[in-house]
Design a protein with these regions (language model features):
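Pre-Walker A (pre-P-loop) alpha-helix and adjacent loop at the N terminus of AAA/AAA+ ATPase modules
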Residues: 15-51
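Walker A/P-loop
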Residues: 45-78, 93
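AAA+/SF3 P-loop NTPase mechanochemical coupling elements
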Residues: 58, 95-96, 127-145
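Conserved AAA+/SF3 P-loop NTPase catalytic/coupling segment centered on the Walker-B
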Residues: 62-68, 97-121, 150-160
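Short glycine-rich substrate-engagement loop in P-loop NTPases that contacts/grips substrate
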Residues: 73-99
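Conserved catalytic/switch belt of AAA+ P-loop NTPases
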Residues: 113-135
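Conserved AAA+ ATPase core "coupling" helix
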Residues: 153-187
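Conserved AAA+ ATPase small/helical "lid" subdomain
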Residues: 186-238
Length: 241
C-alpha cells in the first residue's frame, strides 16, 4: 500500500550545503569539538544521509549544536515533548525540511516515533486521513538531542548511525561559550557576555539558555543591569528542599 501511494520514485538526497548556505563559521561559539564540527559540515555539504544523536545532561554542548543548526536555511526545529505524529507529518508535507532539529527526543511520543522510523530509514512519509492517502518520498538529515537514551525505543536508537555522548562544561568552557554565543547572536559586548556567563554559573543554573535569557532582558548593556536581572531570577528561583 505504501509503495502504491508513494509510487516508484528514486530516493532523494539531501541538498548539498552549498545550496543551503552552510557558513564556514557555524559553530564558532562552541568551544572545542573541532572533529565533530568538521563531521557535521561534511555531512551537510556533501549531502550525505546521516543521522546524529547527541546525548548528555542539560546545558552541555549538545544544546548549542542544535541552536546553531537551527539557524540554517532548510532546518525545521521541533521538541520531542510537544511534537505529535500528525504534526510531524504535516511539517514534512508543508515545509519539506532538509534538516530536522529535534530536541528532547527522549520524550517523543509513540505516534511521532513511528513517523520518524519511516522517514529516517526509507524517506517514506504516508498520511491517511478521511479515507484519503497521500505519500511523499523525502530524505533528510536528523539532528536529535536528549538527556538520556535509556527511554528511547531500540528501533529508534538504531536509526542514528552517529551517537555522541557529552560531558558537562567546566567553568572556563561555560564562560567562553557564553562570551562567544551572546556576542554573536544577542549583540552583547564580549566583556559583558563574559560577565553574564560568570553570574549564570555562580548564581543560577549553569545553563546557556539562562544566560541567553539574561541578555534578552537587559535594558542597557551594563553590569549593573545584568545584576538586576540576576537578582530577579534568583528571587523567583526554585527552592531546593
Amino acid at each position: 500500500v505504501i509503495k502504491e501511494a508513494l509510487g516508484r520514485r528514486e530516493e532523494l538526497t539531501v541538498a548539498p550545503a552549498g545550496g543551503q548556505g552552510i557558513p564556514n563559521n557555524i559553530f564558532e561559539c562552541i568551544i572545542g569539538y573541532d572533529d565533530l564540527k568538521d563531521e557535521i559540515k561534511f555531512t551537510l555539504r556533501e549531502g550525505r544521509k546521516s543521522h546524529y544523536l547527541l546525548i548528555g545532561p542539560p546545558a552541555t554542548a549538545k544544546s548549542l549544536f542544535l541552536m546553531e543548526l537551527g539557524h540554517l536555511r532548510g532546518a525545521y526545529p521541533a521538541t520531542g515533548s510537544r511534537v505529535s505524529g500528525a504534526g510531524l507529518t504535516d511539517a514534512f508535507f508543508n515545509h519539506q525540511p532538509k534538516i530536522l532539529i529535534l530536541d528532547e527526543i527522549d520524550k517523543i511520543p509513540m505516534d511521532a516515533t513511528a513517523v520518524l522510523l519511516s522517514v529516517m530509514e526509507s524517506g517514506d512519509v504516508l498520511e491517511t486521513k478521511y479515507k484519503r492517502q497521500r505519500g511523499l518520498k523525502h530524505d533528510l538529515v536528523v539532528f536529535a538531542a536528549g538527556n538520556t537514551d535509556k527511554t528511547m525505543p531500540p528501533e529508534l536508537l538504531s536509526r542514528f548511525d552517529t551517537k555522541l555522548y557529552f560531558s558537562p562544561y567546566s567553568f572556563e568552557e561555560f564562560v567562553s561559550v557564553c562570551r562567544g554565543y551572546l556576542s554573536r547572536y544577542e549583540n552583547v559586548p564580549r566583556v559583558l557576555a563574559e560577565y553574564i556567563g560568570i553570574e549564570t554559573w555562580q548564581q543560577l543554573d549553569k545553563d546557556v539558555r539562562t544566560a541567553r535569557g539574561i541578555a534578552r532582558r537587559l535594558r542597557e548593556n551594563t553590569t549593573d543591569d545584568v545584576n538586576r536581572v540576576v537578582r530577579f531570577l534568583m528571587k523567583y528561583a526554585k527552592v531546593h528542599e
